[in-house]
Amino acid sequence: MHPPEATTKMSSVRFMVTPTKIDDIPGLSDTSPDLSSRSSSRVRFSSRESVPETSRSEPMSELSGATTSLATVALDPSSDRTSNPQDVTEDPSQNSITGEHSQLLDDGHKKARNAYLNNSNYEEGDEYFDKNLALFEEEMDTRPKVSSLLNRMANYTNLTQGAKEHEEAENITEGKKKPTKSPQMGTFMGVYLPCLQNIFGVILFLRLTWVVGTAGILQAFAIVLICCCCTMLTAISMSAIATNGVVPAGGSYFMISRALGPEFGGAVGLCFYLGTTFAAAMYILGAIEIFLVYIVPRAAIFRSDDALKESAAMLNNMRVYGTAFLVLMVLVVFIGVRYVNKFASLFLACVIVSILAIYAGAIKSSFAPPHFPVCMLGNRTLSSRHLDICSKTKEVDNMTVPSKLWGFFCNSSQFFNATCDEYFVHNNVISIQGIPGLASGIITENLWSNYLPKGEIIEKPSAKSSDVLGNLNHEYVLADITTSFTLLVGIFFPSVTGIMAGSNRSGDLKDAQKSIPIGTILAILTTSFVYLSNVVLFGACIEGVVLRDKFGDAVKGNLVVGTLSWPSPWVIVIGSFFSTCGAGLQSLTGAPRLLQAIAKDNIIPFLRVFGHSKANGEPTWALLLTAAIAELGILIASLDLVAPILSMFFLMCYLFVNLACALQTLLRTPNWRPRFRYYHWALSFMGMSICLALMFISSWYYAIVAMVIAGMIYKYIEYQGAEKEWGDGIRGLSLSAARFALLRLEEGPPHTKNWRPQLLVLLKLDEDLHVKHPRLLTFASQLKAGKGLTIVGSVIVGNFLENYGDALAAEQTIKHLMEAEKVKGFCQLVVAAKLKEGISHLIQSCGLGGMKHNTVVMGWPNGWRQSEDARAWKTFIGTVRVTTAAHLALLVAKNVSFFPSNVEQFSEGNIDVWWIVHDGGMLMLLPFLLKQHKVWRKCSIRIFTVAQLEDNSIQMKKDLATFLYHLRIEAEVEVVEMHDSDISAYTYERTLMMEQRSQMLRHMRLSKTERDREAQLVKDRNSMLRLTSIGSDEDEETETYQEKVHMTWTKDKYMASRGQKVKSMEGFQDLLNMRPDQSNVRRMHTAVKLNEVIVNKSHEAKLVLLNMPGPPRNPEGDENYMEFLEVLTEGLERVLLVRGGGSEVITIYS
């Protein structure tokens, strides 16, 4: 409590807190809180001798961000006052005067009674007051307490695409609102399994064996490894992008478009959409191939006995059945998309069972290989679909008669007088084991490639029979297409796509930033292992001619991979059929929603119609367009021709994902803070290079077409072309590029994600034109991890015509210092008659177009208390007011000479952030930027916030930790409780001393003695040039003072001066009897209490960042404002006072 000496001056000074719930606290949006409509709170003054301890110790509310308290302040500075609360308001001079209700004095200027608002007669609608945060109360409407925001900032809602429409439709039909379920899916169910289902597909079952047989084990292993490396590098880049903020529902398109902008985002989004649509066509074609070739071959509508026409007939069958399947699947998606999602797990189970059957069969083949004989004529493979026996003759009733094979190669069914094929005559028909098994050593024969032209007979590579041509009408197994390494790359690549399935479900994930990287990378590792191991197993277990037999003609029409599986080939056939059907349904479900998301962004006007949906959110028009494009893929009818098209679009998409990550990393934008740490721009660049190489390796003409399509979309969206203004060589090119870039920059404020500190550093110069505080420039260089603009400015007071040379010299001095401190930026000096005007001109006019500063950096005016000249601190406060009016952020470095140089490096320590009021998030962003510099890199960030009596400090700490997690900022969190609201004697006396000093200086300035008159006259006449620094330059007071000095001395003026001295002595006598103003006591109480807790927690911190209170609305309180700031920062070595510009500079979203 109060010491005895304090009681002689005051009876009792206490705060009485009466908590009251405010019902109209404004709601806050997830991205940018609405800070403009905060309701005000009521304050009244009363007198009480005692307040029960329970009124200060009991927690009043546990609702963070939803309720706040209304403070009822009891303040009785004099013991002779009456206890009636109305006594406080009886004096007319104590009426509240705000900016809108100011009294107009005789001089025509608005003037309030106190420096700050003193609202003792409260009316509804006035400003917000808080017992412990009185210093910040004037701006509580625009800079609210942290405790009132944390709950809304930490808890955001993530709706999936169409979920809002679904919910609204259900509410309309059911007549009541159902609570929205929060996302609960984890890494395994939400990312890992969907990625497995989308990566494993038709290529694994229908084409991988053929790829191994054609390319050989070594080249096939290389193809699979390159494709898997491409997707792994892309997944790393995607993980960095996905963990750079809260991923909205919408997945990959939103990640790419928000990372690269609307032009690239629209182009890549459409490429991704077309890829997904053609994937649906590919899966449908795969399902039809399994159905017609392996399950029900008799269902074929078109048939041909001619080997050359058989493939054409098969393509027509694929078109008919494919169209029918597409219509059926579109109806399923249109009517019941929920059933598609419900059966997804069943389709995934089919895939997993099929893969396990392959491994089981490979293991079993090592000791008991399955019996699948292959009929060979010499080295040539025969189709066993129409053979009754693998022999030229057969025994019937003890008689040797020609077999069906004889009839295929001879023109007569009789042994005599038959003319047979020459190769048939000279070679024997033998039967070999199609699956020799793992221990057979067949792996050595399958190591090397065996590429064939179209129509070539498949035969053993050891002894080719190229000397005798075969008749294509015979029952040979033929190559249906011309094969090459590049073709196989294009065909196989779709089997590794699908890595974005997890990010597409981002809205359903409980913690997307954790689940997407882990689940995606684990899924790629799993699928890569399966593919690579299957390449080796297929080559080690299956005969080469069987591997190259794409449709299983040599093994009686069985699926080749099915012949290896255990317990039955039908496990693979049925499993692969259902898995391809499921994958097709998933593609037809996802592609329309992707198109709908692109259309809703309204970046491509002619797609706007596809953004409309049914009442339940289903994109009907987008589904119809998707079906039409998929039909084009089905009309192609060949899986081997559709796969390279699909590869192009996915490779284009992956290329831009890697490009986005590489650009963000190299540009080092402040918003680029991925929680996933294992990325590097070199990995992204390597992934981008592999994607580009694969595009041209697989099909160079398809690659060019895909790029042209993407380029046309980019051009359509925004690109208008740069003017060819070359000038004189490289400099002309640089000027043209700079002009083009400046014109492209937005004139308006940038998006929160793109905000970076563009600094205007105000430096002080001494009489020799040297920088007084070079460490301020050092600090600015350490902040430039944001890679923004830096302008170094200073003001020389004088006449421009006379001081132009000095300005050039000072500019060169500053440039040399900038070079020494490695600050890349521009220097701007202004010669002005008055310092305030010069600073105002700098703040208003620096920069060009979109490259304008948004943050002002300046030093604290040290020694302002000791200076007789008030211009030092008046210039400082004027600068604060100008930056506030310009909506710029302000950084004030106190004790800047103690700040570290670029050579010093802290090996440990803390950067402490005291987040008291929210003003845009600058306090969160600055320590992150500082930690990017080597000087501060090893420091840890600690964030403190203040809890009042009514706040739930435990919930505040949880909310703050959650908010920082979403911001991707690693920091230690602590909530400091400030429950004690007693005003101490020290606070009271400190306020009294402050007010006495201000009053005394005011009297001294009004009654200057004449002993300085002659000295001042000589000094003014002899000073030809006076260069003053920011903080101690000419002001309007200069003219007034000089008028006093140069006045003519008369008897009347002497008598007037003598009377003024007597009046001045009476004023000094009044100082001894004055009592401190109540509002100043409360503000001093805030400064003292905050300083106590800050010094207690942060006295050893390497740097303390603190909210800077705004200057008083009434200029009469400027000196008190400086005193409050001094008290607030006493006892701290390095302090950075931060004042936001009023706009959000940091966001949790990507």
Swiss-Prot record:
Outcome of swapping T991A: Constitutively enhanced potassium-chloride cotransport activity. Significant locomotor deficits
PTM statement from Swiss-Prot or TrEMBL: Phosphorylated, phosphorylation regulates transporter activity. Phosphorylated at Thr-991 and Thr-1048 by OXSR1/OSR1 and STK39/SPAK downstream of WNK kinases (WNK1, WNK2, WNK3 or WNK4), inhibiting the potassium-chloride cotransport activity.
Bias (Basic and acidic residues) ranges: 163-177
Region entry Scissor helix, spans: 682-691
Regulation of catalytic or functional activity: Inhibited following phosphorylation by OXSR1/OSR1 and STK39/SPAK: phosphorylation takes place downstream of WNK kinases (WNK1, WNK2, WNK3 or WNK4) in response to hyperosmotic stress and subsequent cell shrinkage.
Transferase listed as a keyword: no
Subcellular location(s) of the protein: Cell membrane; Basolateral cell membrane
Protein name: Solute carrier family 12 member 6
Organism listed in the record: Mus musculus
